Amino acid sequence: MKKTIKNSTHRPEDILVHAIKKRRSASGDVKNAVKLKEGEDYLRVEEEIPHDDNVVVIDDGCDHDHDVDDNDDDEEENGRYCRREFDHGYHLVKGQMGHGMEDFIVADTKTVKGHNLGLYAIFDGHSGSDVADYLQNHLFDNILSQPDFWRNPKKAIKRAYKSTDDYILQNVVGPRGGSTAVTAIVIDGKKIVVANVGDSRAILCRESDVVKQITVDHEPDKERDLVKSKGGFVSQKPGNVPRVDGQLAMTRAFGDGGLKEHISVIPNIEIAEIHDDTKFLILASDGLWKVMSNDEVWDQIKKRGNAEEAAKMLIDKALARGSKDDISCVVVSFLQWID
């Protein structure tokens, strides 16, 4: 079953998408994944994310164990476990770059092994939307289905990214077409596991004015050695940004089969604690970060209590500063502790 929701417009060339409350089935299945299809002027809401049973699981290396299944270590008061409530909102705008909408997001919750999970992601496609579309529908399922996710999330996420990319290259796109990814899994409002490839970014903001970027911008001028070690090169034309083999403005991405030998899909991963004064987790595509710094983003929304309003305010500010690209933003707000 599918639903469509008509959207109001900020101006004719924009597509604005406001926050939608998610539903969760008794079994914990993800419901109502947000999908804005290329060429459409409306939001299509899918009832359920399909699971891909054809992804081949491979082992691409080892990481030290970092157990995130820590129910036994939760803070206790009077013998009861304490957890942190959290909520989310999001906003998307189609840019003015002469192509269809290529940004896709996930903003959802589900329960797994007794944990309340927040699943948040930005997928910023390039040379088409097919890869970003596929990632929105499959990547979280592939991550959470890894048998060692709770015991060794870094190893599990790297394996899921790699196996998903292998499937994409074989079945979804040819030599052109790819996507960034920033995925964040919030666990009981206490801990967050963040992974990324490309230049979509995530930051954590605390009321003490501490703003921490928890992703890495995979830009060619910062990873020249990586590209060179794979047999590629980084070049820059006057007035343009550095590019891998003169083509791609990032060193890590899903897809991009024609450049795969010279780029990587292995993500940077960080596991962070949510502090008592942590207020927001913010994920956004580079349409926002090109015109606003991390500190400017925090300054704009620090007084906001509503995540949806915060996400819309940030995109409105980016538009006012002249951003022409697709812009997507997910804001997670951390609320009171509960037991």
From Swiss-Prot:
Catalytic reactions on record: O-phospho-L-seryl-[protein] + H2O = L-seryl-[protein] + phosphate; O-phospho-L-threonyl-[protein] + H2O = L-threonyl-[protein] + phosphate
InterPro entries documented for this protein: PP2C, PPM-type-like_dom_sf, PPM-type_phosphatase-like_dom
GO MF annotation list: metal ion binding; protein serine/threonine phosphatase activity
Free-text comment on the cofactor: Binds 2 magnesium or manganese ions per subunit.
Residues that, per the record, bind Mn(2+) 1: D124, G125
Record-listed Mn(2+) 2 binding positions: D124, D286, D325
EC number from the UniProt entry: 3.1.3.16
Record's keyword terms, sorted: Hydrolase, Magnesium, Manganese, Metal-binding, Protein phosphatase
Domain PPM-type phosphatase, chain residue ranges per copy: 87-334
Cofactor: Mg(2+); Mn(2+)
Enzyme class, UniProt record, top EC level: hydrolase
Family indicated by similarity: Belongs to the PP2C family.
Protein name according to UniProt: Probable protein phosphatase 2C 28
